[in-house]
């Protein structure tokens, strides 16, 4: 547990679910989407090289699976800012005890959840609503 995040492991080593904590009052709320110090304090060791934003118009759309081969593999922080998705990560790390296994999680703005995906995983999602915005 860190200040603005509740980070929990999954059955796949290195893959984590991040629940963001919102601080609010009568004006609205504030939530931190990313903080390298808090992730490192929770044991995250891989740098996040980039953040991408997508908009998917139609419910039922599948994006993925995306994967980068060494030496271009990268860690990802995947967040749904609008709508809802079923997000999946597949362990493709050679020699991993969970090689070939997958984990899925519903991500939405309402549940304030993200997936923290280490290098060596494929990633994709299916939109469960129209007008999904991912970060």
Predicted regions and their residues:
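Non-catalytic, conserved peripheral segments adjacent to functional cores
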Residues: 1-113, 129-131
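Short alpha-helical functional segments enriched in proximate histidine and acidic residues
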Residues: 124
């Amino acid at each position: 547990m860190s200040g603005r995040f509740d980070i929990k492991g999954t059955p796949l080593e290195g893959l984590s679910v991040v629940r963001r904590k919102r601080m609010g009052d009568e004006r609205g709320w504030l939530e931190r989407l990313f903080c390298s110090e808090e992730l490192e304090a929770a044991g995250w060791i891989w740098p996040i090289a980039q953040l991408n934003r997508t908009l998917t118009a139609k419910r039922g759309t599948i994006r993925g699976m995306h994967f980068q081969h060494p030496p271009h593999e990268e860690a990802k922080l995947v967040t749904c800012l609008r709508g809802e998705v079923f997000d999946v990560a597949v362990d493709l790390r050679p020699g991993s005890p969970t090689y070939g296994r997958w984990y899925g999680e519903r991500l939405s703005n309402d549940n304030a959840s993200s997936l923290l995906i280490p290098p060596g995983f494929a990633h994709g999602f299916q939109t469960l609503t129209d007008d999904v915005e991912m970060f």
